[in-house]
Amino acid sequence: MRQPAVRLVRLGRVPYAELLGLQDRWLRRLQAEPGIEAPSGTEAGALLLCEPAGPVYTAGLRGGLTPEETARLRALGAEVRVTGRGGLATFHGPGQLLCHPVLDLRRLGLRLRMHVASLEACAVRLCELQGLQDARARPPPYTGVWLDDRKICAIGVRCGRHITSHGLALNCSTDLTWFEHIVPCGLVGTGVTSLSKELQRHVTVEEVMPPFLVAFKEIYKCTLISEDSPN
């Protein structure tokens, strides 16, 4: 049986708004297709990957930022956006791998919780390939990937009519001081970390991209088709 195919779109370092715009176009594209179980080998959607070009704080469906906090964060020079993903406030910025799979879960044989667990598994596997064997996901209601009490990967998704958007943010060489201005994901008493901090060397988004794609293909049991144009 042929594996479902997923379009791979690598945007490089781009403004966060550009990622959201492309995500919306893929959402409309999938929503316009017939909502039926697809035969084997059918395309299941797109995997959008990028590194944010500038600092952005985002709030999810559960909120997380008051108007006063929003004004304070903007005064720091960061963009602030309210998104449709699950979860509370977090930070995105240079040195971070953003992965937004826009997928019809029916074509992958997945339910939403399995999709979230699969994203966590991709991040755990990447950490293992980088030499961090203690990376773990936590049981619900927690999401993301941790090294002890330090969060290295945040996850927040949205799903409507079986179609997902948003995804994960994994800290490679992120300036972690940006997280000091919020309570990341609403979790008091926990810290954040990055691959660079844990490995004591500079780890770029470009470096981790190939092993991440290997992990994604293995865990989602799909093939990846490179997309020359993001449109």
UniProtKB/Swiss-Prot annotation:
Its EC number(s)? 2.3.1.181
GO terms classed as biological process: positive regulation of oxygen metabolic process; protein lipoylation
What keywords tag this UniProt record? Acyltransferase, Disease variant, Ligase, Mitochondrion, Transferase, Transit peptide
Please report the stretch or stretches of sequence annotated as the BPL/LPL catalytic domain. 41-224
| EC class of the enzyme, as a word | transferase
GO MF annotation: an example: lipoyl(octanoyl) transferase activity
Family, per entry: Belongs to the LipB family.
User: Mind telling me what this protein is named?
Assistant: Octanoyl-[acyl-carrier-protein]:protein N-octanoyltransferase LIPT2, mitochondrial
| Organism of origin | Homo sapiens
